[in-house]
Amino acid sequence: SAGVGPSRSLLALLFGAQFGGFLTLVGVGSNASAASVMSEMGYKPFGFFTITPFGIGICILGTLYFTFVGSKFIPDTGYIPEFADAGKKELDKKKATIAGITMLCVLVVIAMNPKNVPMHVAAVVGALVVVGTKCMSVKDAIHAIDWNCLILVGSLTAISTGVQNSGAGDAMAKMILNILGDHPSTFMITTVIFFAAALLTQVMSNIPTILLFLPIGFSIAQAINVSPYAVAMVITLAGAASYATPFAAPQNMMTVGWTHYKFSDFIKIGIPMVLITYLVVVIAIPIFMPY
């Protein structure tokens, strides 16, 4: 109705969701994965809003870039997804209210981070409430679960632990340490670690990158005697900078399926966003989470 093709709208929605994902721990799957790895390795995980100061800068600069520059590179492929008219369907206000309140309650519990209610337990309880109140059928709930993603994340969580315990993480850390030198500046540390993780996430996807690279980051932090939390934050933000290829995040692949955008479209729009994210990180890390 606004005269904008569905394919262009979907890519704008994709980037908007990614910008917003930087604002909280659960905004992007890779953020939550980082917290999980930190907990597994004996570190206190990031809080719900620890990432927020960085996310605000990324959201503001990212939105300005996309509005005035990036949107000019979005072609209209002419493809119309099957759900393009979903907004025209009649809304069940009762179910929508229940689902909205349930989601809000889950987010509040996660934000409060009570010791006896882990994040995943709160999410499962919320899902059961939605199904129990018939906002969603059991069949639809089962189909909504991305089983491939669950298996991938579960497997890579074990692999990330193995990388650390086997010494492979230390070996990879030494390669990066050779690049950093004996007395690297905080700027050099942030730059090398950020681009190593950001490059990996473009070809490997964000969650696997976090699960595999975070143990390496902790080894680097120990070797050069800097805060492991600062290094973890750099890796987390770099891993979430999944803009430049269709492979960088599951939602990118979904968007390609719906819009038929090309690899080159993501590169043209996404690379500047990776650089914007880096700019925010290199400025904000010394302020909000110094080494």
Write out the residue ranges for each language-model feature.
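Juxtamembrane and boundary regions of transmembrane helices in multi-pass small-molecule transporters
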Residues: 2-15, 20-85, 233-291
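Structural signature of hydrophobic alpha-helical transmembrane segments
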Residues: 27, 55-61, 116-127, 175-189, ...
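Cytoplasmic-side transmembrane-helix entry/capping segments in multi-pass membrane proteins
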Residues: 8-15, 143-152, 213
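Short helix-coil transition sites and intra-membrane helix breaks within transmembrane domains
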Residues: 21-30, 115-119, 162-169, 199-212, ...
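Hydrophobic alpha-helical transmembrane segments of multi-pass integral membrane proteins
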Residues: 25, 182-220, 224, 228, ...
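Hydrophobic transmembrane alpha-helices of multi-pass small-molecule transporters
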Residues: 50-174, 190, 273-274, 278, ...
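Membrane-interfacial loop-to-helix junctions in multi-pass transporters
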Residues: 2-9, 45, 94-100, 146-150, ...
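Alpha-helical transmembrane segments of multipass membrane proteins
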Residues: 18, 37, 41, 107-111, ...
